[in-house]
Amino acid sequence: KVFERCELARTLKRFGMDGFRGISLANWMCLARWESSYNTQATNYNSGDRSTDYGIFQINSHWWCNDGKTPGAVNACHIPCSALLQDDITQAVACAKRVVSDPQGIRAWVAWRSHCQNQDLTSYIQGCGV
C-alpha cells in the first residue's frame, strides 16, 4: 500500500507516534517519505552485511526482524520481516517504536540524518489536520 501523505500522518498520530520518545509526527513523516516514499511494500537489499530493509520505515533484518536469510540476525522486534510489508502498519509502528527506544533513537536511520535532521519539516504534515 502506498499511503497518501495526510492519510499516513493521521494513521501515525492515531498510533501514538506524535511525541513518542520526543519524536514529532513531522519527523516520522519525513523518515517514511525518504525511506519508502510512504510505500509499505518497499524493500532494499544491503550487500555489505546481506541484510534487507523492509516496509514503510525500512526496518533492517540484521537487527529487528527475521527473514530467514540474514546471517547472524537478532530479531529484536520478534517478528517475521514479512509483517513489515503489510497494508496494516500496526506491527511496523510497534517495531519502529522499539528501534527508537534504543539510545540512538531516530538517528538509527541514515535517511533521517541525511534529509530530516535540522530541517524545517512543517510541509510533511501541513494541511492534514493533525
Swiss-Prot record:
Disulfide bonds join 6-128, 30-116, 65-81, 77-95. It is found in: Secreted. Coiled coil: none annotated. Monomer. InterPro entries: Glyco_hydro_22, Glyco_hydro_22_CS, Glyco_hydro_22_lys, Lysozyme-like_dom_sf. Residues 1-130 form the C-type lysozyme domain. The sequence shown here is a non-stomach isozyme. GO terms for molecular function: lysozyme activity. The lineage of its organism: Eukaryota, Metazoa, Chordata, Craniata, Vertebrata. PROSITE patterns: GLYCOSYL_HYDROL_F22_1, GLYCOSYL_HYDROL_F22_2. Keywords: Antimicrobial, Bacteriolytic enzyme, Disulfide bond, Glycosidase, Hydrolase, Secreted. Its main location: secreted. It holds the Pfam family Lys. Lysozymes have primarily a bacteriolytic function; those in tissues and body fluids are associated with the monocyte-macrophage system and enhance the activity of immunoagents. This is Lysozyme C, kidney isozyme. The active site is at residues 35, 53. PANTHER family: LYSOZYME C. Belongs to the glycosyl hydrolase 22 family. One of its GO terms (biological process) is defense response to Gram-negative bacterium. It catalyses: Hydrolysis of (1->4)-beta-linkages between N-acetylmuramic acid and N-acetyl-D-glucosamine residues in a peptidoglycan and between N-acetyl-D-glucosamine residues in chitodextrins. GO terms for cellular component: extracellular region. It comes from Ovis aries (Sheep).
